[in-house]
Amino acid sequence: MIDYSQFPRKNILCVDMKSFYASVSAVTMGLNPLTCYLAVVGNTDRQGSVVLAASPALKKDFGIKTGSRLFEIPEDPRIHIVNPQMKLFIRVSTEITKLFYRFVPEKCVHTYSIDESFLDAGKEDPEEMAKAIQSSMWREFGLMCTVGIGDNMLLSKLALDLESKKTKSGIARWRYEDVPNKLWKVRPLSKMWGIGGRMERNLNRMGISTIGQLAKFPLELLEKKFGIMGNQLYYHAHGIDLSEIGAPLMQGQISFGKSQILLRDYTRSEEIKAVLLEICEEVARRARTHNKVGRTISLGIGYSKDELGGGFHRSKTIDLPTSITMDIYRCCLMLFNKFYSGKTVRSVSVTLSNIEDDVNQQLSLFEVDNEKRRKLGFVMDGIRSKYGSKAILRAVSYTPAGTALQRAGLTGGHKS
């Protein structure tokens, strides 16, 4: 039996904006987000386009939800069908994060996604804080939110996903003591945060169909079968999570970065490297635009939900600062080849930091063509600036793995 007294007990809030895209769109149109019928669709011109968000009333009365298709929405004059306004969504999300800073210090906020955040309430009453946040959210933005509260980040997320969205108050709290009664009965396994379809099938073949059965399965057998993921599965099934809400970067620190959630799972190294090159190109372009160069290059790889999430984030500091695409790419390749474990990838990020002004950089004896490559980057930037981002692309962008061509002109992967 797990001795929970050996583990930290915090007051973590997981705040989720209810039908965020649909609700923001409704408020912008002067509609009540709780009672109107509204769907945000990837592209209203394509009948097969995916529903990105549906208002609560549309879900309840018409059965239309995230993942439905445009052609499935009934032709009813009461239903509003709109394209996503990604710039607006990002702006509202940023303002909501600022609202959180009124309740807790910035270092106690972790933005998990555009519509979901974790807050460490410290010694404050977490339930009172949750109610106050809900009240402020409705008063200032006209938006509803649900809140999960837990002794750690995992329990707060589980309280959110599995209970708070079903309660009248929109608030639920899970403590370590609630795990046997609330978590262990959960089935199918994929209802639990962090367990994807592939892992669920693997566990089912081992005779595990509930979280309770997973919690009681021998730890050594799980570790033998799944390695470190087996250890994580076991302890998550007991509600144990030692994740910390990370401190933010120092105010004023400059870096240039780009992160991308891929439109599908990438399993082949060559495909991942193609996307990586595109991202390095964009990071280098941003640095050049500001006449900056950087010495520290960071690579982040996020694994698919089917792989239990996770991933790695590693950095390397080079001798000569750069804003040259291939310099950044070579460094990222080195990090990728060293730390990538062969799992399915769903997100990639690259950051250039340790920034300084781009003025008469010292030429390396082994990089005599540095200045030519540097000037080439500026020429390519100029062409894109004048004729559009699709005017000149690297060959990888025209392969099935490339994303730059499709994402050109989009915000967050969708229409602006």
From Swiss-Prot:
Family: Belongs to the DNA polymerase type-Y family.
GO biological process: error-prone translesion synthesis; SOS response
Protein name, entry field: Putative UV-damage repair protein UvrX
Occurrences of domain UmuC (ranges): 12-196
Cofactor stoichiometry and binding remark: Binds 2 magnesium ions per subunit.
Active site, renumbered: E116
Cofactor: Mg(2+)
Residues reported in the UniProt entry to bind Mg(2+): D16, D115
Keyword terms: DNA damage, DNA repair, DNA-binding, Magnesium, Metal-binding, Nucleotidyltransferase, Transferase
MF GO annotations: damaged DNA binding; DNA-directed DNA polymerase activity; metal ion binding
InterPro entries for this protein: DNA/RNA_pol_sf (IPR043502), DNA_pol_Y-fam_lit_finger_sf (IPR036775), DNA_pol_Y-fam_little_finger (IPR017961), DNA_polymerase-Y (IPR050116), IMS_HHH_1 (IPR053848), Rev_trsase/Diguanyl_cyclase (IPR043128), UmuC (IPR001126)
